[in-house]
């Protein structure tokens, strides 16, 4: 099975989309390779174990997304940060598990530099203490990624509270600060929004590699019908 910690599969990534039935729900390692080297859209969403009657809303949203229907994700769990206005924040959604993204940084399977400026970076994680999350954020900062992406879509960070002295750590606040740092004045102001996707419930399905819109005022994410 494809699990989160399977980097040994990456050298064979090309066989995944030359297959007559390429996987569309791979872990972050494979999400990134497929999204970088092909035009396939992959999906970050519920797994088979989540197909339960009490998860009907998640499953309905999953199949609507798979069918390419217009999706409006609302309400989002927290108010947005950053560039708040009447315009849409628009970009290509890329990313996945934050720990794995940091592992891939600097490799041929990470985001191509030329794609950074049209990217809305999605991150989520589970079981990582705040000091580890900040270390990963610093890696993205020092690489120049945060100062160039359009925005950050923060998913669910399950069991990431840390010790009592770490509970005040605010990932969204710190990320926005770094996104504004050394930013090219020709780029639009960055923003941070939040979505319930990651580990736990509810779990929205996100199409990685697709164009999405974020509406600042209504605090909603819009996934438009797409073909690739």
What is each stretch, according to the model?
Residues 94-134:
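Oxyanion-binding "anion nests"
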Residues 1, 121-125, 150-155:
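Short, glycine-/small-residue-enriched flexible loop/hinge segments at domain edges that mediate gating
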Residues 40-102:
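Conserved anion/nucleotide-ligand pocket segment
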Residues 10-34, 41-46:
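Short, acidic/small-residue loops that bind anionic groups at enzyme active sites
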Residues 132-228:
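C-terminal active-site/capping subdomain that shapes the small-molecule cofactor and substrate pocket
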Residues 25, 29, 53-57, 92-100, ...:
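Conserved active-site and cofactor/substrate-binding residues in soluble primary-metabolism enzymes
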Residues 20, 40-42, 91-92, 99, ...:
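Structural motif
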